[in-house]
Amino acid sequence: MKPMRQKNTRAQGNKSISNALASKRKVSKNQVVFFDYRDERKLKRFINDQGKIIPRRITGLTAKEQNLLTHSVKWARFLAVIPYVADEYK
């Protein structure tokens, strides 16, 4: 008889994905994260070319950090520090 192979469970499949994404973290784990709505250069690191906020799974931020980032980006857009949409999409 052939030995039975283990099925890939969802939990096993996600382990390799989470390990790969952990290295993509744009902010150091030890660094205290503070997003200032006036810091245009720092906010633009987390916005793609269409003007959308990059999701957590790509940036590597925690839920709390992503929430602070989103709030800062939205407030900066409201105050016209950064544009809502990129120029080529207007």
From Swiss-Prot:
Q: Record's Pfam families?
A: Ribosomal_S18 (PF01084)
- Cysteine disulfide links: none
Q: Does the keyword Phosphoprotein apply?
A: no
One biological-process term from Gene Ontology? translation
Show the GO MF annotations: small ribosomal subunit rRNA binding; structural constituent of ribosome
Does this entry carry the keyword NAD?
no
Start-end of Polar residues biased regions: 9-21
- Name a single GO cellular component: ribonucleoprotein complex
The UniProt function text for this chain reads: Binds as a heterodimer with protein bS6 to the central domain of the 16S rRNA, where it helps stabilize the platform of the 30S subunit.
Q: Which NCBIfam families match?
A: S18
- Family, similarity comment: Belongs to the bacterial ribosomal protein bS18 family.
- The protein's name in its UniProt record: Small ribosomal subunit protein bS18
Q: State the gene name recorded for this protein.
A: rpsR
